[in-house]
Regions:
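Catalytic cores of Mg2+-dependent Asp-rich isoprenoid enzymes
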Residues: 1-99, 105, 109-264
Length: 264
């Protein structure tokens, strides 16, 4: 399937006639908004990693994956919303990563029952956990809780750091993006409230919580940019690693911000 998608992407970024309506529509979008091929190609690479069943030994490996399946979406959306400065694109990339980290933390049990583990494997193994045995019979363990806790902390830093980027978006776009970021961050809060157990349960937000978040997002759209100071602190600090998020997304952001016209 993905080989076919690669060929279709090549065709979109060529000058050859296109017969399919999806390809024609996507070519129109990438040309109108100057979306470089590197961005959707990175998304397809992340999907290929999923198809291969790839695991992630280190936190840095997991960020490389999150860039491909999360940051790419944020960057493409930001380009379509008319912003292509490097700072706003970097914030969008980090927001995409934050949402992907939240997804991973929410779906630990669901993924495990399909034989998949996205949490960084080396720290789990070094703590004495036998990953293959655990995947054969998933159950909540302190090592899993600790890994989820660390990832959610990083996700929260990324959500906070994305605020200024959202404030730089067109006013009509801000409420939806802010609402999405708040809803995903709230999923992280629900996981914390359950003692980080996303093996035996799946976190969700109530209708009342969703409505309250939508109201907060609407207020955010009218607030001045100065109301949202940049969040301090690097991501990945708990592991002693450098700022993994911005480093991991740097190439993607550079390609998107420097690409101005044409389809390839």
């Amino acid at each position: 399937v993905l080989v076919g998608l690669d060929r279709r992407l090549d065709a979109v970024y060529s000058d050859a006639p296109l017969s399919g309506p999806v390809e024609r529509a996507f070519r129109s979008v990438v040309r109108e908004y100057a979306i470089p091929r590197d961005v959707p190609a990175a998304l397809l690479e992340g999907l290929r990693w999923d198809e291969e069943g790839r695991g992630y030994e280190e936190l840095s490996d997991l960020y490389d994956y999150a860039v491909r399946v999360g940051s790419t979406v944020g960057v493409m959306m930001t380009l379509v919303m008319g912003r292509r400065d490097a700072e706003t694109l970097a914030d969008a990339a980090e927001l995409g990563m934050a949402m992907q980290l939240t997804n991973i933390c929410r779906d630990v049990g669901e993924d495990a029952r399909r034989g998949r583990l996205y949490l960084p494997a080396r720290p789990l193994s070094e703590s004495g956990m036998h990953i293959e045995d655990w995947l054969a019979s998933p159950a909540m363990r302190p090592e899993i809780a600790n890994s989820i806790s660390l990832l959610l902390d990083d996700a929260d830093r990324l959500y906070a750091r994305s605020w200024k980027g959202i404030a730089r978006l067109p006013s009509q776009s801000r409420p939806a993006i802010r609402a999405a970021s708040l809803l995903y961050a709230e999923i992280g809060n629900e996981i914390r409230s359950a003692g980080f157990d996303s093996v035996s349960r799946r976190a969700w937000t109530s209708r009342g919580t969703k409505l309250a978040i939508l109201a907060r997002a609407a207020l955010f759209a009218r607030a001045p940019r100065s109301a949202f100071p940049a969040a301090a602190g690097s991501v990945g600090g708990a592991t002693g690693l450098p700022d993994l998020a911005r480093q991991a997304a740097a190439g993607l952001v550079r390609a998107a911000s420097n690409f101005r016209s044409g389809a390839g």
